[in-house]
Amino acid sequence: MFSSAHSGLLEKLFHYIDLHQDEFVQTLKEWVAIESDSVQPVPRLRQKLFQMMALAADKLRNLGAGVESIDLGSQQMPDGQSLPIPPILLAELGSDPEKPTVCFYGHLDVQPAQKDDGWLTDPYTLTEVDGKLYGRGATDNKGPVLAWINAVSTFRALQQDLPVNIKFILEGMEEAGSIALEELVMREKDHFFSSVDYIVISDNLWLSQRKPALTYGTRGNCYFTVEVKCRDQDFHSGTFGGILNEPMADLVALLGSLVDSSGHILIPGIYDQMAPITEGEKTMYKNIDMDLEEYQNINQVEKFLFDTKEELLMHLWRYPSLSIHGIEGAFDEPGTKTVIPGRVLGKFSIRLVPTMSPSVVEKQVTQHLEAVFSKRNSFNKMAVSMVLGLHPWTANVNDTQYLAAQRTIKTVFGVNPDMIRDGSTIPIAKIFQAITQKSVMMLPLGAVDDGEHSQNEKINRWNYIQGSKLFAAFFLELSKQHSGHQMPSSVY
């Protein structure tokens, strides 16, 4: 896989990373200590976000990168306050036309976290317990961003020429919807991204605790609300119960018409757009190393709907799913309040798979709910709205950087990676692919039990350090495998 010269350099790179792993962990501790929460619209936290982006910019400049901090202006909040948006960092290290250029995307903002949410440690004090580094942002996404930086800094420390040109795009609002990112990518398409050959994202997890993975697809997401309204005020059930169409009863019937107890979506035509299953895809599922019992235990689930690995993965990745999320306007507090809500709003979403279109799904959902509501002969008013429509994403697993990543994983970890999709929605992958027309790859570092977004988020020291080695080796292998520009395309 690697020439003798490259093998010798790899040994030096890996040895340096091992020797300096405590320094790398200390840097992660410093980054985790910054409460860069983008979700809560609080001036103090916005200041923390600016502090985080400035720290990252300094880190990149110390590597010798040219860094541009893009001012994004301010954000008007529903309560009338105006909050500054943290800048997006565009950084560049090397511009040799003989080398491929790889751009790394990451985010430095985090979800909210407090000790009394159920954390065993202070979420903003990186704490190591049995090789696990606990802290908010450790795996999502500060750890992977630093692992990439660690790889670059190792070449620098050993006075070795980087085999690829490196670019960074780092944002601070991913957890709040990546405000202004798509517009920036569009604006920079013919500038910052013009020389980019490959884009790497490391913002998801492996399927297991020990076996690495490469991700080649994510599901899209259509988020809906359905409102049923009689009037703005609530009713007393003793005064009005039995003499009107209750909005809650209508809404429960509507939500109950969407999906059955086996997870099958009941909306007519919803499966018609789905890409057919290929033999190559079936083989991929068979080759994935997954223990169903372990997966159930890790996720604290007594039993899933499906008994085989292949069925479970297909329903998680390549079949659409429908989830009901909640009801606004309903009484949900302790006690025995006998109110009839005058207006209720149901919320549900459908995860899309290739080659489903949000606009088609919106039409199908609306027609289905209107038909169900019509049969109830209710005097209430119903309104359906799709508030979010995000496309699914797939990559070409046979393009240069995927082949390079597979070989690199074999070198660093000694095993071939699981080729996986992600059942969630990561819009940035589709945004990069659609706008830049470059090869986009998701190369995760974290284990399945890292707990991103939840209490006790962590990244294993082993994943963090081996991930730093992985990225360093990837630079060498990508340089070797690079054979000109390849347009990303659907894997199926």
Curated annotation (Swiss-Prot):
It is an enzyme of class 3 (hydrolase). GO terms for biological process: proteolysis; regulation of protein metabolic process. GO terms for molecular function: carboxypeptidase activity; dipeptidase activity; metal ion binding; metallodipeptidase activity. It is found in: Secreted. Binds 2 Zn(2+) ions per subunit. It comes from the Eukaryota. GO terms for cellular component: cytosol; extracellular region. It catalyses: Preferential hydrolysis of the beta-Ala-|-His dipeptide (carnosine), and also anserine, Xaa-|-His dipeptides and other dipeptides including homocarnosine; carnosine + H2O = beta-alanine + L-histidine; anserine + H2O = N(pros)-methyl-L-histidine + beta-alanine; L-alanyl-L-histidine + H2O = L-histidine + L-alanine. Pfam families: M20_dimer, Peptidase_M20. Coiled coil: none annotated. Its cofactor is Zn(2+). Detected exclusively in kidney. Zn(2+) 1 binds at residues 140, 175, 453. Zn(2+) 2 binds at residues 107, 140, 203. The active site is at 109, 174 (proton acceptor). Keywords: Carboxypeptidase, Hydrolase, Metal-binding, Metalloprotease, Phosphoprotein, Protease, Secreted, Zinc. Its main location: secreted. Catalyzes the peptide bond hydrolysis in Xaa-His dipeptides, displaying the highest activity toward carnosine (beta-alanyl-L-histidine) and anserine (beta-alanyl-3-methyl-histidine). Belongs to the peptidase M20A family. This is Beta-Ala-His dipeptidase. It comes from Mus musculus.
